[in-house]
Design a protein with these regions (language model features):
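Alpha-carbonic anhydrase
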Residues: 3-4, 18-244
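Sec-dependent signal peptide hydrophobic core
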Residues: 5-10
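N-terminal signal peptide c-region/cleavage motif recognized by signal peptidases
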Residues: 13-17
Length: 244
């Protein structure tokens, strides 16, 4: 029973596994990103929103902002193939202190190729670490992967990817979240949205400046499980300020 409750709580906090699942959306055909805003009234922001994600990060304003204050704690993890991405739900204790508020990591998932771009450069893989505060507000830390040496924490995750859609598995070997991140945590900050329906806005985005590596084999393994690209196209900036 506790395991089922954990799954339910984590799915309720997910980008991809939300009320949006009641309407078919995806990345191909009539359900692709160009059609999201017309699939349901709940998805209207996908078409009409003015602060949508992802974006091309360029001409960022250099300004002093607080360094990322992250804390990590080992605990229960579950890995899900929900048909839109591979997602890892995590237990409590992984926190981000931002704007004098504490955000708790709910899950992290991946997009290939990357959704955000940096100075017009698209990366082969992007990870999103989804944090939520006590009021339900979300902050996303985005991590870029470039092709290079194999990534050991990523290998741990990929070895446990469920092959079937909607398959949920307990993570046998925990994924070292902190080890996924680069040594330098310099970041770009802007206000954006969910990159999947319902495209809700008011999300604090923190895109890490420095990528980490993943091997070509690891990138291809993710793509072969997804069977399609799972990135939303770049959205207009509409005058938003990007802080670096």
């Amino acid at each position: 029973m506790k395991g089922k409750l954990f799954i339910a709580l984590m799915l309720s906090a997910s980008f991809s596994a939300s009320a949006a699942d009641s309407v078919h959306w995806g990345y191909e055909g009539d359900g692709d990103p160009a059609h999201w805003g017309k699939l349901s009234p709940d998805f209207s922001l996908c078409e009409t929103g003015k602060n949508q994600s992802p974006i091309n990060i360029r001409q960022a304003l250099n300004a002093q902002h607080d360094p990322l204050q992250l804390a990590f704690q080992s605990g229960t993890q579950q890995i899900i193939n929900n048909g839109h991405t591979i997602q890892v739900n995590v237990g409590p204790g992984n926190t981000l202190l931002l704007d004098n508020e504490t955000f708790t990591l709910q899950q992290f998932h991946f997009h290939a190729p990357s959704e955000n771009e940096i100075d017009g450069k698209q990366f082969p893989l992007e990870g999103h670490f989804v944090y939520k505060n006590a009021d339900g507000a979300l902050t996303v830390i985005a991590l870029m992967f470039q092709e290079g040496a194999a990534n050991l924490p990523l290998a741990t995750a990929w070895q446990q990817i469920p092959a079937r859609v909607d398959q949920v598995e307990d993570v046998r070997t925990p994924i070292a979240i902190q080890a996924l991140l680069p040594t330098s945590l310099n970041y770009y900050r802007f206000s954006g949205s969910l990159t999947t329906p319902p495209c809700s806005e008011g999300i604090r985005w923190l895109v890490l400046e420095n990528p980490v590596t993943a091997s070509a084999e690891q990138i291809n393994q993710f793509s072969s499980v997804m069977h399609h690209a799972n990135n939303r196209p770049i959205q207009p900036l509409n005058g938003r300020i990007i802080i670096h």
